[in-house]
Every structure is written in C-alpha cells, then in structure tokens.
Amino acid sequence: MSYAVKEIFLTLQGEGAHAGRASVFCRFAGCNLWSGREADRQDATCKFCDTDFVGTDGTLGGRYASAVELADTIAAQWTASNDNRYVVLTGGEPLLQVDDALIDALHARGFEIGVETNGTIAAPDGLDWICVSPKGGSELVLRRGHELKLVYPQALAAPETFEGLAFERFSLQPMDGPEVAENTARAIDYCLRHPQWRLSVQTHKSLGIR
C-alpha cells in the first residue's frame, strides 16, 4: 500500500513517558475523528486538536509508494549513532495507515517503534510502544498498551473512566489553549490526589522545538 504523510522530522519527544528522547516523528495525514479543517471543527470529536495533519505539504511530506521507501526516508533523518533509534508514528490517526510491512521495514532499520493513537482502531502486532490518547465521545477499542495519555479536562472523558484498563502508565496532560494555566493547576491537583496518574506537560512548546 502507499502512505500519505504530512511530515517527517527529527526532534526530541516533548511529552509523555519518553519526553526528552531523540525521535524521528512521522506524522501521517488524515484522522477518523476530524477532517482537520477549521470549518469542520465544531463537528469534530476532539475540538481541541492543535495539530495540522491535513495534506502532504510538510517537511518530507508526500505519498510514499512503499513501506521500504518510507522507512528509508525515516532512517535518513537519524543523524546520530545507530544506537537507540526511535520513531514516533503519529497523526492525525496513524493506525489508519500503519501496517505490518512498515513495522517490519522500520525494525529492519534498527528502530524501536512508538505510536500515538486515539485508540479507536485496533493496532497491528509488533509496535514497541503504544500510547493511547482517548477522546471523549469516541469508542475506545485499544484498551491495553504501554501508556494512556489523557488530555485534561475533557467532557465525557473523566480520568477515573480509564483507571481499570491494562496500561503500564497513566499520564494526565493539561489541555492547551486560553485556559492552560487553570487546566494545569487542575491536572496537578488531580495527580496529587490520584498518584496512579503522572503529569505530562508539552515541553516542546516551552522549548520552541517541533
């Protein structure tokens, strides 16, 4: 199959359990919860989405004809030693496109593979790190993984709803926007009262990196 990719770039992971880790980000175009167009935001399941995943016009974006071509492009962005190679497959919703062929091609190039997903689509085998970020009002299909990262607060997505699921780590991330200070204070308070949850902040935004 071919892959529609918005952008590919090397950066430090800015949030969640792998914050601070060198990572190649591969952002896939398209999502099943929102078109990505502002005109449709009010009809989106996640109206707070802050990511541009529309089209293929970003850095190294395009339609890749094969898993090998895409994996080679990702590998070319890794400028350090061959140790600790890490790729984050994100979106949009990456599981609309990620398949066995791409997973095999990335593993063959020495990458540990992380995926950031809204959890509404079953994940293929072979992913090394599954981070699910549930969206209120959507059906959660992926009910186990390595990390559940909840943007907080969210209507229809209270943290206690997810505490019994089979995840190794639970992260609470303050919702960005005009009320970020209040949301951060609320998230801190929640984590203090419910230590199963760890605070996740978007460090890449404060550092000015992608």
UniProtKB/Swiss-Prot annotation:
The keyword Magnesium applies. InterPro entries: 7-CO-7-deazaguanine_synth-like, Aldolase_TIM, QueE_Cx14CxxC, rSAM. The lineage of its organism: Bacteria, Pseudomonadati, Pseudomonadota, Alphaproteobacteria, Hyphomicrobiales. Its EC number is 4.3.99.3. Pathway: Purine metabolism; 7-cyano-7-deazaguanine biosynthesis. PANTHER family: 7-CARBOXY-7-DEAZAGUANINE SYNTHASE. It comes from Bradyrhizobium diazoefficiens (strain JCM 10833 / BCRC 13528 / IAM 13628 / NBRC 14792 / USDA 110). It catalyses: 6-carboxy-5,6,7,8-tetrahydropterin + H(+) = 7-carboxy-7-deazaguanine + NH4(+). SUPFAM superfamilies: Radical SAM enzymes. Homodimer. Catalyzes the complex heterocyclic radical-mediated conversion of 6-carboxy-5,6,7,8-tetrahydropterin (CPH4) to 7-carboxy-7-deazaguanine (CDG), a step common to the biosynthetic pathways of all 7-deazapurine-containing compounds. Binds 1 [4Fe-4S] cluster. The cluster is coordinated with 3 cysteines and an exchangeable S-adenosyl-L-methionine. Binds 1 S-adenosyl-L-methionine per subunit. Belongs to the radical SAM superfamily. 7-carboxy-7-deazaguanine synthase family. It comes from the Bacteria. This is 7-carboxy-7-deazaguanine synthase. The keyword Cytoplasm does not apply. HAMAP family: QueE. Keywords: 4Fe-4S, Iron, Iron-sulfur, Lyase, Magnesium, Metal-binding, Queuosine biosynthesis, S-adenosyl-L-methionine.
